[in-house]
């Protein structure tokens, strides 16, 4: 079944989903092939290491994060990006409160 968001997403019309542990998520635009998600982290919050079958590209909109992917760890800041291959262990720790913009291919049905 085809899934698709509205054409426009406005900050004041989107709800934050509380994921616990100082992490919140907003679902942005999506269809069956792609999804964009905004994730807000408080300082010290952790995106626990995990694996999924999706390609993922993350843009650091604000803050500072320690990211681990495919066995490598780097500090990333606003303006930086991270690519996570499918089926690769990855996770992050928020060093300074911030927002990540995650893009997935295909759509993360488990987020809807």
What residues fall within each predicted segment?
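A short, N-terminal "cap"/entry segment at the start of jelly-roll beta-barrel domains
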Residues: 1-33
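Conserved short histidine dyad/triad with adjacent acidic residue
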Residues: 20, 35-51
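Short, conserved beta-strand element in jelly-roll/cupin
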Residues: 40-41, 51-67
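Histidine-centered metal-chelating micro-motifs
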Residues: 46-47, 66, 82, 86-91
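Structural motif
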Residues: 57, 64-66, 73, 89, ...
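Ligand-binding loop in jelly-roll beta-barrel domains
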Residues: 86-110
């Amino acid at each position: 079944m085809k899934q698709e968001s509205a054409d426009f997403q406005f900050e004041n019309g989107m709800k934050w989903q509380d994921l616990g542990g100082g992490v919140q998520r907003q679902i942005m635009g999506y269809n069956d092939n792609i999804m964009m998600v905004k994730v807000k982290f408080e300082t010290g919050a952790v995106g626990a290491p995990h694996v999924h079958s999706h390609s993922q590209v993350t843009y650091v909109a604000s803050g500072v994060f320690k990211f681990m992917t495919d066995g490598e760890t780097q500090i990333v800041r606003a303006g930086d990006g991270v690519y996570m291959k499918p089926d690769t262990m990855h996770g992050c720790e928020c060093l300074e409160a911030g927002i990540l913009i995650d893009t997935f291919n295909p759509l993360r049905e488990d987020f809807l």
